[in-house]
UniProtKB/Swiss-Prot annotation:
EC number of this enzyme: 4.2.1.9
Protein task: Functions in the biosynthesis of branched-chain amino acids. Catalyzes the dehydration of (2R,3R)-2,3-dihydroxy-3-methylpentanoate (2,3-dihydroxy-3-methylvalerate) into 2-oxo-3-methylpentanoate (2-oxo-3-methylvalerate) and of (2R)-2,3-dihydroxy-3-methylbutanoate (2,3-dihydroxyisovalerate) into 2-oxo-3-methylbutanoate (2-oxoisovalerate), the penultimate precursor to L-isoleucine and L-valine, respectively.
Name of encoding gene: ilvD
InterPro entries listed in its UniProt record: Dihydro-acid_dehy_C, DihydroxyA_deHydtase, DiOHA_6PGluconate_deHydtase_CS, ILV_EDD_C, ILV_EDD_N, IlvD/EDD_N
Entry protein name: Dihydroxy-acid dehydratase
Length: 617
């Protein structure tokens, strides 16, 4: 039997003071000796994906108490990437991931909690909590707030679904009237929950499910549907069971590092590739793997991207399907079921809810014989009412989407492509790799040669696009926006949205050492590593250079000889401290907090995690 961690502060004469403090929180004699379960909530009124989470911690806590545990809730911060987008607020988004990971670690270790429930939802919150879970390696379950419903709008007499990206795109299109822009704006985000497409938030919540760290349906059940309530309640019950198995029966299969093993990371990345998830997931999975000492790297992602088919295309890659449609088609379990039938999944792995993934698929994959309760769960439908109230609808679809030929989730024989929705490119521009979401790239530009239009910041890129300087055949190259150079690795959602609104989405490329929102599509290549501020070749490119992109060959090169690149590098190094910095001044206030982040962070190929060895002696 492994002693409960919490005994450090609850047992023994010398802990009388600590017990006195525990009693002041409401604990009674009979509570000492029970597992203490930390609930990391992320409620905030700033973020629609988190605005409904205020009472979720206590919902989980009630189930923990009923199952024989003691629940203690705390909160983390949560940044809304959409609100922080397009201005200096975005500098803080990625660094907030590290703050969240640290906050969870600090609270759990300072108070010797035995296990953890992570209530997350949006872009950096789920990754930050995942990093913390892998560091701490105590029993952990994730339960997210769920996706929002897709918006509905009637324009020109036709109803169609819309989301946040539609509002951004039409706002940059001078041909769209102010009235229509306002109509879409008012319709784009109708409910609480994470934005309704396969953007970063929903991608990451799907991937915690694929890793085995959350319950079936976590990635896809709508925030507004009563079906999600059951996930919170079940998480409270199961975490107590996991804690007792770990400490009372020495069952190490309950630990995050046992569940989220190398094979589980392969599974999660395979799901990501199959569903054409956000490119940010690459960054976050690499970071989580490093925290858990799992040797999962860009090379593994490259290998998987060449063999995993693209089975699911969701907004922003199409206007036909949204997260509510993914759920109706069976959710993550439906995608994993197709990968299983194709022989592309490790199934002998534990999860927080079943001894093996195979057992989970046997129960939850809608194309296998499943019971009526499972079928009803995946029929959970949007209520179609503007609301910030969770669990406010019990509406059901009339039927499931089990069409694997043309439905939301396809089988191997009807895949969009035999290689997946994400790809890693290498070449003299990105020796350590870069990422492209191929699910969002038009087939006509899978190979592309273009002329560099050099931008030393996202702001300059926006100005050049809206100013009419970018033409068909151009490569908008945005540098010094990486983790160190930004700092903070800004998302380039506005530049990609404005390229689309200007009719350039299928005739231009955007290449950057920054990153892209999960809402970006088009030939958008990010995470170029090493970044410019770290001495990467992207810092040597000049206006008018030619870049050659070949996605099928997984290649990206600037058309320069090795000798020319070496000469440019020598000239850059000769500038001393002035080298490897933007050639043009930027109006950007970088606070001491951001400078500290920049001093410790690494390039995207390492997940932009901190490397404290840079300052250790």
């Amino acid at each position: 039997m492994t002693p409960y961690r919490s005994r450090t502060s609850t047992h023994g004469r010398t802990m009388a003071g600590a017990r006195g403090l525990w009693r002041a929180t409401g604990m009674k004699d009979e509570d000492f000796g029970k597992p203490i379960i930390a609930i990391a909530n992320s409620f905030t009124q700033f973020v629609p994906g988190h605005v409904h989470l205020k009472d979720m911690g206590q919902l989980v806590a009630a189930e923990i108490a009923a199952a024989g545990g003691v629940a203690k809730e705390f909160n983390t911060i949560a940044v809304d990437d959409g609100i922080a987008m397009g201005h200096d607020g975005m500098l803080y988004s990625l660094p907030s991931r590290e703050l969240i990971a640290d906050a969870v670690e600090y609270m759990v270790n300072a108070h010797c909690a035995d296990a953890l429930v992570c209530i997350s939802n949006c872009d950096k919150i789920t990754p930050g909590m995942l990093m913390a879970a892998m560091r701490l390696n105590i029993p952990t379950i994730f339960v997210s707030g769920g996706p929002m419903e897709a918006g509905k709008v009637v324009l020109g007499g036709t109803e169609r679904s819309v989301d946040l990206i539609d509002a951004m795109v039409v706002a940059g299109d001078a041909k769209v009237s102010d009235a229509d822009v306002e109509t879409i704006e008012r319709s784009a985000c109708p409910t609480c929950g994470s934005c309704s497409g396969m953007f970063t938030a929903n991608s990451m919540n799907c991937l915690t499910e694929a890793l085995g760290l959350s319950l079936p349906g976590n990635g896809s059940a709508l925030a507004t549907h009563v079906a999600r309530r059951g996930l919170f309640e079940e998480a409270g019950r199961r975490i107590v069971d996991l804690a007792k198995r770990r400490y009372e029966h020495d069952d190490e299969s309950t630990l995050p590092r046992a569940i989220a093993s190398f094979k589980a990371f392969e599974n999660a990345m395979s799901v990501d590739i199959a569903m054409g998830g956000s490119t940010n997931t690459v960054l976050h999975l690499l970071a989580a793997a490093q925290e858990g000492e799992v040797p999962f790297t860009m090379a593994d992602i490259d290998r998987l991207s060449r063999r995993i088919p693209h089975l699911c295309k969701v907004s922003p890659s199409t206007a036909d399907f949204y997260m509510e449609d993914v759920h109706r088609a069976g959710g993550v379990m439906g995608i994993m079921g197709e990968l299983s039938r194709a022989g592309l999944l490790h199934e002998d792995l534990p999860t927080v809810h079943t001894p093996t993934l195979k057992a989970a698929l046997d129960h939850w994959d809608i194309r296998r014989p499943v019971d009526d309760a499972v079928r009803a769960f995946f029929r959970a439908a949007p209520g179609g009412v503007r609301t910030v109230v969770p669990f406010s609808t019990d509406r059901l679809w009339d039927s499931l989407d089990d069409d694997r030929e043309t439905g939301c989730i396809r089988d191997l024989d009807h895949a969009y492509s035999r290689d997946g929705g994400l790809a890693v490119l290498y070449g003299n521009l990105a020796p350590n790799g870069c990422i492209v979401k191929t699910a969002g790239v038009d087939a006509s530009i899978l190979t592309f040669t273009g002329t560099v239009r050099l931008c030393e910041s996202q702001d300059e890129a926006v100005a050049r696009i809206l100013g009419g300087e970018i033409q068909a055949g151009d490569v908008v190259l945005v540098r010094y926006e990486g983790p160190k150079g930004g700092p903070g690795m800004q998302e380039m959602l506005y530049p990609t949205s404005y390229l689309k609104s200007r009719g350039l989405g299928k005739v231009c490329a955007l290449v950057t050492d920054g990153r892209f929102s999960g809402g970006s599509s088009g030939l958008s290549i990010g995470h170029v590593s090493p970044e410019a501020a770290a001495g990467g070749p992207i810092g040597l490119v000049e206006e008018g250079d030619i870049i050659v992109i070949d996605i099928p060959a997984r290649s990206i090169v600037v058309d320069l000889s090795d000798e020319e690149l070496a000469a440019r590098r020598s000239a850059m190094e000769a500038r001393g401290r002035a080298g490897w910095k933007p050639a043009k001044p930027r109006k950007r206030a970088v606070s001491p907090a951001l400078r500290a982040y920049a001093a410790l962070t690494t390039s995207a190929d390492r997940g932009a995690v901190r490397d404290v060895s840079q300052v250790e002696r």
